[in-house]
């Protein structure tokens, strides 16, 4: 809920003017996301659970009265939509300019900082030094921290007072005496491989330390998303956890302890270098991260992952509003157990999942793991719906929900044809493809951006095969790892989620199946530009094709599973369906060209079947235009191979954009021709090749044996007609009106541009890791032995007041409105060279092709040539022979001249 402060608890420079607490109705996600939450007591602590000293902090720490009492974001004032806004609820001009002025935080000019190459990164590096902060380096007292088993560094750090104060007293009262769950953040420097992160080696996690059963482990994998995308996912997850905690009649969640203690959220960041440092400020604001605590190595042994743990009730919305609890209403967020794993180096998503499953999963032993990508926002009760599918089906091994494109406010993103086409593609996949595969029991792909697995179902061979794609295991696995794979297998692991799905269903001795949960929905952002779209689909298409072939080749392993005869029967049907689909995909390039030419010839070439008429430009102009369209189609198709074999999509942005436009125009032209064909067929204005006056039986027989317009009508009805019918059956038809036209325009580009680029770059598997120099900013941990001969390290001991003052600056940075970075459109020197090469090769090929077509093709006779192709070929051949003869004669004359000149010079040369 959002609240601007009230009564005596407000900062002195605010006038509340009777502003009251706004209770949000349960489930009003959009309203809640637009409100900032800002109310808590200030000044001295009012109870024993408000004082951090009561929870194990150092007794020498002075009491801080700091609390989260305002939103730091400008323009954050909330206006009640049902009442007139009161003057006191709106910030003064001074507050709007510098909302943190009440806490002594200087104003900061917003700048388009982002990701890993600008000033925010440099500032982050400076804050990692011991004692580093807004005031520069300081010298603090130190404390000695004993290492677990003499090698594992695991330290508890006090969280800022404001974060402690945000936890509701009823949760703190329920904790065991001496617990530091809400008062301290736990940091562990993991200097081992994920497989070695075990209790035996001294590593542990808080939920296991508190002897809690983990039913649901929610994982968010992250690469370099900005703080808005990350907040969108994290806030959506916390709202979903609230849905679960608020269940009143649950037979499961309300037994054996509070529901929130059975849920763990794990964020896995793939490397310090690509990570957006502003996102770390958001995590620090909710208490799950702190600057200056990470260690680059422990006694020279490099840290592989930095693990933070904290249980928080705070959240930050995508528009940088701080949400915290104020009452016991249904809209209040419950405590959420969070783990934040920041890998030191970028080592790809499969390695992130290895940390999740092999390291954290084996310690927590969850029943269900839900996987999300940063930027994917789960809808209301989506995670609950996914979990319920597992709870109600003991043989369910994996599930996924519906992913739809993020359309923006008022569906404004649909103005972009690429976004609209992808929206239609996602919708039809969720209406036709996923339900079909779910009926068979084998969903070929559970998207990594939004899916769930039963942990014990994927343990063993499924995860073992899945992790063969982790390049950090290449030396350990040898020939079975990435280094020993051929190019086909490497492409297969570009769609690693498909491998996991197949291995799960084919698991020996088990009868796990996969399903699609329609009630579970999530939205994700999709590429809006042609280069990004092409690059994304290159990985998807190559990976899915290779993984599909893999599943067909290894289908025999299904016989070792525990599926019953009915399930096996349907799995065989699905296998035949997949084979048929693969064949159609393989020949799609030729199929699209033939479909285009056949339809244009049926309506554009005058014949007895169409009454010697031609549509749409008349029988004289239409054949000429159709011929031009065919040559343009083939020309741009050839261009795709030239571009794909030598250029990056970002380096040929204009060429690809032009290709999308040209193929879109041709597609519209063909659709108009097809509709005209259908209209003529049913209007009776043209003879058809099926009978309508000899009964239903004869009609169906002639209709389905049709070889002309009838078969085209069948194809149109079987695709477009079914799209409409199925969409209305699922009560979700809007994409047919908002996105279907755009999809029709882009449909041919899916084949002619995306498939060509993907297959032409089959060699690009992008397995290399990026270098990481950001870890150099982290300090090292050196151990010593104390008087008791125990291995310890010396760690700084910050006063609570300094922790709070540094936190003020952190919150200010986190809640500063996000400014998207300005992407540089400049081409690299290599891109410029490749572009020139592409233009040169394109001009050379097309000019030669143009000459060959003009000479040999009968189709150009329509352009007014007075002679036939045979005559033109004969004359060209004559001209070519004469030209070669003239050139040879010219060369001979030159040789004779040189020989004569040399002879004369020999006669008169001085010796």
UniProtKB/Swiss-Prot annotation:
Membrane topology (UniProt): Multi-pass membrane protein
Catalysed reaction equations from the record: [(1->4)-N-acetyl-beta-D-glucosaminyl](n) + UDP-N-acetyl-alpha-D-glucosamine = [(1->4)-N-acetyl-beta-D-glucosaminyl](n+1) + UDP + H(+)
Gene Ontology cellular-component terms listed: cell periphery; cell septum; plasma membrane
Keyword Transferase on entry: yes
Record field: transmembrane: 579-599, 624-644, 659-679, 711-731, 840-860, 879-899
Basic and acidic residues compositional bias, start-end: 12-34
UniProt-recorded Gene Ontology molecular function terms: chitin synthase activity
EC number, as in UniProt: 2.4.1.16
InterPro entries per UniProt: Chitin_synth, Chitin_synth_fun, Chitin_synth_N, Nucleotide-diphossugar_trans
Region feature (Disordered): 1-66, 107-138
Regions of compositional bias (Polar residues) in chain numbering: 54-66
Top-tier EC class: transferase
Classification via CDD domains: Chitin_synth_C (cd04190)
Keywords linked to the UniProt accession: Cell membrane, Cell wall biogenesis/degradation, Glycosyltransferase, Membrane, Transferase, Transmembrane, Transmembrane helix
Top-level lineage group: Eukaryota
UniProt subcellular location: Cell membrane
BP GO annotations: cell wall organization; chitin biosynthetic process; conidium formation; hyphal growth
Keyword Acetylation: no
Matches recorded under PANTHER family: CHITIN SYNTHASE, CHITIN SYNTHASE B
Purpose of the protein: Polymerizes chitin, a structural polymer of the cell wall and septum, by transferring the sugar moiety of UDP-GlcNAc to the non-reducing end of the growing chitin polymer.
UniProt record similarity statement: Belongs to the chitin synthase family. Class III subfamily.
Protein name per Swiss-Prot or TrEMBL: Chitin synthase G
């Amino acid at each position: 809920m959002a609240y601007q402060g009230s009564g005596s608890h407000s900062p002195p420079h605010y006038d509340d003017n009777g502003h009251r607490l706004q209770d949000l109705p349960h489930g009003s996600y959009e309203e809640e996301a637009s409100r900032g939450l800002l109310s808590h007591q200030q000044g001295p602590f009012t109870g024993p659970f408000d004082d951090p000293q009561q929870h194990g902090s150092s007794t020498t720490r002075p009491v801080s009265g700091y609390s989260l009492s305002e939103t730091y974001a400008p323009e954050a004032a909330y206006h009640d939509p049902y009442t007139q806004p009161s003057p006191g609820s709106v910030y003064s001009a001074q507050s709007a300019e510098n909302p943190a002025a009440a806490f002594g935080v200087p104003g900061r000019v917003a700048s388009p900082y982002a990701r890993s190459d600008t000033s925010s990164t440099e500032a982050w590096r400076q804050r990692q030094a011991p004692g580093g902060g807004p005031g520069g380096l300081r010298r603090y007292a130190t404390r000695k921290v004993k290492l677990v088993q003499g090698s594992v560094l695991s330290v508890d750090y006090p969280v800022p007072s404001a974060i402690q104060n945000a936890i509701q007293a009823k949760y703190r009262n329920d904790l065991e005496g001496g617990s530091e769950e809400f008062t301290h953040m736990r940091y562990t420097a993991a200097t081992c491989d994920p497989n070695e992160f075990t209790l035996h080696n001294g590593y542990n996690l808080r939920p296991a330390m508190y002897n809690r059963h983990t039913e649901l482990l929610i994982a968010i994998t992250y690469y370099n998303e900005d703080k808005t995308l990350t907040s969108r996912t994290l806030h959506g997850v916390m709202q979903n956890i609230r849905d679960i905690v608020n269940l009143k009649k649950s037979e499961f969640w309300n037994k054996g302890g509070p529901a929130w203690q059975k849920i763990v959220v794990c964020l896995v960041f793939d490397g310090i270098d690509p990570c957006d440092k502003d996102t770390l400020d958001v995590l620090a604001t909710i208490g799950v991260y702190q600057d200056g605590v990470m260690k680059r190595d422990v006694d020279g042994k490099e840290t592989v992952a930095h693990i933070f743990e904290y249980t928080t009730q705070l959240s930050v919305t995508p528009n940088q509003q701080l949400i915290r609890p104020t009452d016991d209403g249904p809209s209040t967020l419950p405590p959420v157990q969070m783990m934040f794993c920041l890998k030191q180096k970028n080592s790809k998503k499969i390695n992130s999942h290895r940390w999740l499953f092999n390291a954290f999963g084996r310690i927590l032993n969850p029943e269900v793991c839900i996987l999300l990508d940063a930027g994917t926002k789960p809808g209301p009760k989506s995670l609950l719906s996914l979990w319920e599918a597992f709870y109600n089906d003991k043989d369910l091994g994996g599930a996924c929900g519906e992913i739809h494109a993020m359309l923006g406010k008022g569906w404004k993103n649909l103005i972009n044809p690429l976004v609209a086409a992808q929206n239609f593609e996602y919708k039809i996949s969720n209406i036709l493809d996923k339900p079909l595969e779910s009926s068979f029991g084998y969903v070929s792909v559970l998207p990594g951006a939004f899916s769930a697995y039963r942990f014990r179902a994927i343990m063993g061979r499924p995860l073992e095969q899945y992790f063969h794609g982790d390049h950090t295991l290449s030396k350990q696995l040898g020939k079975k790892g990435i280094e020993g794979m051929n190019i086909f297998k490497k492409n297969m692991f570009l769609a690693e989620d498909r491998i996991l799905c197949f291995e799960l269903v084919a698991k020996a001795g088990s009868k796990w199946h996969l399903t699609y949960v329609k009630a579970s929905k999530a939205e994700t952002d999709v590429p809006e530009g042609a280069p990004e779209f092409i690059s994304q689909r290159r990985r998807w298409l190559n990976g899915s094709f290779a993984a599909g072939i893999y599943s067909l080749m290894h289908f025999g392993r299904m016989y070792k599973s525990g599926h019953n005869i009915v399930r096996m029967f349907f799995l065989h049907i699905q296998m035949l369906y997949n084979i048929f689909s693969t064949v159609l995909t393989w020949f799609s390039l030729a199929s699209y060209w033939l479909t285009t030419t056949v339809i244009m010839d049926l309506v554009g070439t005058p014949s007895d079947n169409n009454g010697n008429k031609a549509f749409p430009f008349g029988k004289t102009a239409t054949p000429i235009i159709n011929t031009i369209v065919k040559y343009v189609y083939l020309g741009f198709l050839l261009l795709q191979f030239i571009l794909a074999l030598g250029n990056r999509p970002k380096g040929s942005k204009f060429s690809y954009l032009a290709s999308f436009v040209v193929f879109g125009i041709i597609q519209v032209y063909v659709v108009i021709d097809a509709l005209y064909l259908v209209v003529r067929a049913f209007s009776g204005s043209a003879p058809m090749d099926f009978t309508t006056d000899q009964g239903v039986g004869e009609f169906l027989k002639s209709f389905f044996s049709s070889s002309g317009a009838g078969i085209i009508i069948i194809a149109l009805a079987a695709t477009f007609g079914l799209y409409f019918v199925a969409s209305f059956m699922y009560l979700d038809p809007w994409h047919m009106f908002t996105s279907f036209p755009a999809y029709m325009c882009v449909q041919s580009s899916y084949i002619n541009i995306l498939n060509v680029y993907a297959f032409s770059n089959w060699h690009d598997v992008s397995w290399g890791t990026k270098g990481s120099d950001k870890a150099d900013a982290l300090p090292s941990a050196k151990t010593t032995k104390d008087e008791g001969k125990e291995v310890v390290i010396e760690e700084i001991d910050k006063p609570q007041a300094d922790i709070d003052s540094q936190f003020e600056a952190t919150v200010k940075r986190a809640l500063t409105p996000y400014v998207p970075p300005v992407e540089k459109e400049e081409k690299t020197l290599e891109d410029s060279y490749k572009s020139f090469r592409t233009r040169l090769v394109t001009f050379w090929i097309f000019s030669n092709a143009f000459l060959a077509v003009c000479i040999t093709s009968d189709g150009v006779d329509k352009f007014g040539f007075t002679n036939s192709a045979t005559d033109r070929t004969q004359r060209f051949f004559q001209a070519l022979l004469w030209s070669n003869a003239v050139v040879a004669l010219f060369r001979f004359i030159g040789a004779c001249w040189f020989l004569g000149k040399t002879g004369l010079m020999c006669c008169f040369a001085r010796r």
